[in-house]
Amino acid sequence: MLLIKKAELEQTLREDSQRLRGIEARIKQNQLADDALDVVIKSVPAQLFLSIRTIIPSPEEMIELVQHIQGVIPSRVNQRVLGPFAGIVYTDSFTLTNNDVELGYLLKKPVDDLIVISEEYALQMRELPAVQTMATAVQSGGPELVFLALGRIGQWIEANGYRIAGPYREIGLELSNLSTSDEMIVEVQMPVERLNTTSALAATTRE
């Protein structure tokens, strides 16, 4: 019984800690409201991606997997071949649990081998499709602040008559140790497409 109680208390503390980080992030969002992130529209070419796709149960397990990949892959793949670390989020709505994600490294050149990093995980190369219209925003700070960039892109999409056209990507422009991640710089990339006149008119009518 004591072990069960201990586990329940530890779970409660983890959940409270996540909520606190969310509150702190929202406070910081309000502080940064007058210094809005710029949204840049660009086309992104097809890219080679050494990756694994999986369902991640919790933020803690996400960090563990990211650290594991970052700890193993640079010693198994030539550094001149590795591009930035990247992630793709396939989950439709923002959630802290059970996210469908793809994690790995963008590549400058092909690699041939399946790279096994544990009994559970192996990374394999594939090609990410080109995106003609990608809405992007660069965000610095911890990973919990990525939603600032997502929010800014969402505002741009709504204001300019676009819609989301695929899963969004996070590209690590500068990644510090994840235990002290305040200096991380991440580019959020959201595929978008312009709404046609009929769809936009129908949406306005529904409102």
Enumerate the language-model features and the residues they cover.
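A solvent-exposed interaction/effector surface
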Residues: 1-207
